Amino acid sequence: MAQPTPHAGLQEGLIHEPASEHGGGFPPFQSTTFAAQILWLAIAFGLLYYLMSRVAVPRIAGLLHDRQARLAADLDEASRMKTGADSARGAYERSLKEAQDKAKGIAQATRDSLAAEAETRRKALEADLAAKLAESEAQIRARTATAMGSVREVAADAATAIVERLIGQSPDRAAVEAAYDRTQTVH
C-alpha cells in the first residue's frame, strides 16, 4: 500500500492514490467482465420477472378485482337505495298532497257550516227583531190611540172651559167633540 503523501492545495489528512493503483478503471465498463455482467443481468431480470409474475402481479390483480367487485356492489346498493328513496319521496309527496287536500276540504266544510250557522242565526235574529218591531209598532199604535183619546178628552175639556169662560155658558160636549173630530180629519 502506498504511503499517504500530502499534496499542495489539498487539506491535510486526505489520501490521494493515482489511478494506476485502482486496477484499470470503472468495473462495469471493463470489457473482460461483459459476459459475466450480462449473465447476471439476465439471471436477475429473470428472477425479478418470475417473482413479479408469480407473486406481485397476482396479488395486485386480486386487489383490483376485489376493488372492482366492491365498487360494483356499492353502486348496486346505491342504486337500490336511490330507488327506495325516490319511491319513499314519491309516497311522502302523495301523502302530503292528500293531507293538504283533506285539510282544504275540512277548512271548506268548516267555513260552510259556520256560514250556514251564521245565516241561521241571522235569520232567527231578523225574525226576532221583526217580531219585536211589530210588537213595538202595535204598542206605539195602541199608546198613540190611547194618547189621542186622552188628547181628545183634554182638548174637549179645554175647549169647553174656554167657551164657558168666553160666553159664560157650557157648550154641549157632543158638539165640542164633533168640532174636534172635524179639525183632526183636515190635518
From Swiss-Prot:
Gene Ontology cellular-component annotations: plasma membrane; proton-transporting ATP synthase complex
GO molecular function terms listed in the Swiss-Prot or TrEMBL record: proton-transporting ATP synthase activity, rotational mechanism; proton-transporting ATPase activity, rotational mechanism
Domain of life according to the entry: Bacteria
Pfam families linked: ATP-synt_B (PF00430)
UniProt membrane topology term: Single-pass membrane protein
Subcellular location: Cell inner membrane
Keywords, sorted A to Z: ATP synthesis, Cell inner membrane, Cell membrane, CF(0), Hydrogen ion transport, Ion transport, Membrane, Transmembrane, Transmembrane helix, Transport
Transmembrane segments: 32-52
Family: Belongs to the ATPase B chain family.
Subunit structure and binding partners: F-type ATPases have 2 components, F(1) - the catalytic core - and F(0) - the membrane proton channel. F(1) has five subunits: alpha(3), beta(3), gamma(1), delta(1), epsilon(1). F(0) has three main subunits: a(1), b(2) and c(10-14). The alpha and beta chains form an alternating ring which encloses part of the gamma chain. F(1) is attached to F(0) by a central stalk formed by the gamma and epsilon chains, while a peripheral stalk is formed by the delta and b chains.
Role played: F(1)F(0) ATP synthase produces ATP from ADP in the presence of a proton or sodium gradient. F-type ATPases consist of two structural domains, F(1) containing the extramembraneous catalytic core and F(0) containing the membrane proton channel, linked together by a central stalk and a peripheral stalk. During catalysis, ATP synthesis in the catalytic domain of F(1) is coupled via a rotary mechanism of the central stalk subunits to proton translocation. Component of the F(0) channel, it forms part of the peripheral stalk, linking F(1) to F(0). The b'-subunit is a diverged and duplicated form of b found in plants and photosynthetic bacteria.
Record protein name field: ATP synthase subunit b 2
Organism annotation: Methylobacterium sp. (strain 4-46)
